[in-house]
Amino acid sequence: IAFAREYLCEPMDDMSSLFPSIVLQAAKDSDLRIINRAEGDPDDQYFVGWDPAISSDRSADYTVMVVLRRPSTNPELLELVHVVRRKNMDFRTQIMEIQKLNAKFAPDVIELEANNFQRVFATELRADTDLPIKTFISTRQRRESLLMGLVMRFEREQLRLPWGDENSRTLMSELERELLMFGMSKKGKLDSIGRHDDFAIALALAHWGTTEFRERVVDLDDLMLGLIE
């Protein structure tokens, strides 16, 4: 069944998918579009999710970087505003690309999936730059928490996908295909039956980054309160 769905491009039905099409449809915002740098309210916050890949194989994963914006006027809302999605990006090219994103959006957190070789990115960037790198080490339990957090955000209608121009719609259609492929197996394992899940994982990482930032702010507030007392 998984083979048929993947190669015939047949997504899971809405009863099976973690991200039903009706939920994704509600997230599409025709007034929102992909932007190339931070714009609008300077008090808006930005968060980056980065799922790196290194391989010259044509069937290899994509490197994906997703930028989410948290509007200062509505901090419960998140808006997807920028995407980098490419194959065959070598180590140095990815380092340069994430530095460009940092310069354009000044994110509060860059959440990097850091399993195996991917940890080298964090090591180099922490040594040579002041980028706000946070690493996500993926175990089965943490990956499920990562995805379920994104599911809840969609279900609460607190995440907006850009649908305002052709470029945005093309990118979001690819994201939608990946999200529809996520479900729960008969063995109780939460996973994707798709060939690629990099876009969806990068989005989930960016969302995770927003929660890490909030936890850090709370910790700082608690610390200041303790000092005052």
Enumerate the predicted regions with their spans:
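RNase H-like, metal-dependent nuclease domains and their acidic two-metal-ion catalytic environment used
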Residues: 1-137, 144, 148, 152, ...
